[in-house]
Amino acid sequence: MPKEYTSVSKISGPLVLVENIENVKYGEVVEVKLANGEIRQGQVLEAQEGAALVQMFASTQDLSLKGMRIKFLGHVLEINLSPEILGRTFDGLGRPRDGGPEIIPQKRMDINGSPINPYSRAYPQEFIQTGISAIDGMNTIVRGQKIPIFSGAGLPHATLAAQIARQARLLNEEEKFAVVFGAMGITFEEANFFIENFRSTGALERTVLFINLANDPVIERIATPRFALTAAEYLAFDLDMHVLVILSDMTNYAEALREVSASRKEVPGRRGYPGYLYTDLATLYERAGRIKGKKGSITLLPILTMPEDDRTHPIPDLTGYITEGQIFLSRELHRRGIYPPIDVLQSLSRLMRGGIGEGRTRKDHGDLSNQLYAAYSRGLEAKELAVVLGEAALTEEDVQFLEFAEAFEMEFIKQGEYENRSIFETLNLGWKLLRRLPRASLKRIRPEYLDEFWGKEDAS
């Protein structure tokens, strides 16, 4: 039976120092009983011989050293799991926030989990359709991939995240597909937007939400993505489901990590973030993937807002080293009213080749994508030249590529918030746009594909 201690020696901000204790471990859950009988929870941040530093999950402003009783429960944070979590909304610590009952567990799991052993990993493949042309056609996401969305303050990443969560599916309808959504440090309005969006579109029944609000404790923000990923591991590897995990906003998570690090008086690293930021992010991102011999998979889509749109900031910089590409949102496209404002030239899916082609999407997908990239890039070069020298200085072919680039942005990249394009609609739209250009200029596409698809209005 856990012992109770009254040896609290100091309260500093959200931290409580407990002395004269024994057999306490890092990450252990703590129960704090106040003099008035109220019970609060915390977690051991640091354990040394005879002392422990506890981070509270609630405010410490009204705490007093007198009458406090501390009980170390002997286990780390765990989550109750069963198939009933689908369709439910929880707070950042896995407690129901939708008014529903507590989950009766079929299994309890430690939220810290562990990264997948590289030897046990299966190579990510199999196309995931998001219904968004700039992603499906140009930066394809495959099952088991981890690919972040790099955004900026004021850009519609929340709307894009909700759209992906609603529309994402495998082309094989027989596969069981679920979405786990972990929100960190968001406002009440944003939380309500996600919940109502999923409910009104019928996507809630296959979704699990973990929501940490901006006014919730910082330590809870650090736990939220771990609760979300643990739920995803259960759905994927125990129930054989294919799970898409969306984590938003990882910048709020990193800020919380910096705040906790500062409260512990740790030596800061780049821009005040702890030196272990890279390692900490890796413990989250590397939990995504496929495991040999398991039917299920976890695909991870973390969203982060780059402070001051700075892609060299430690958070996007370190994220890029761990993940397998990025989807980049453009402020310039957003300013021109293009949604989703995905900058396809700065975006990249490193595992795209494993998820496209004959038997997965369509045999012309790879060549078509390469040609669209090349044509769009040349069109933007012509646009820059026209700004400097005027359109009169452009050749006839330059003008054609310039018009193609404008049409590509307005017809291919731009689409409605509730517009769900199939991969075949996306590919056919790409061919439709390429017909604006001389056939001889399409040098990235094999002649046999040109012969087969150039004259077809719709192919499947």
UniProtKB/Swiss-Prot annotation:
It comes from the Bacteria. GO terms for biological process: proton motive force-driven plasma membrane ATP synthesis. One of its GO terms (molecular function) is ATP binding. Keywords: ATP synthesis, Hydrogen ion transport, Ion transport, Transport. The keyword Lipid biosynthesis does not apply. InterPro entries: ATP-synt_VA_C, ATPase_a/bsu_AS, ATPase_F1/V1/A1_a/bsu_N, ATPase_F1/V1/A1_a/bsu_nucl-bd, P-loop_NTPase, V-ATPase_su_B/beta. The keyword GTP-binding does not apply. Belongs to the ATPase alpha/beta chains family. Produces ATP from ADP in the presence of a proton gradient across the membrane. The V-type beta chain is a regulatory subunit. This is V-type ATP synthase beta chain. It comes from Dictyoglomus turgidum (strain DSM 6724 / Z-1310).
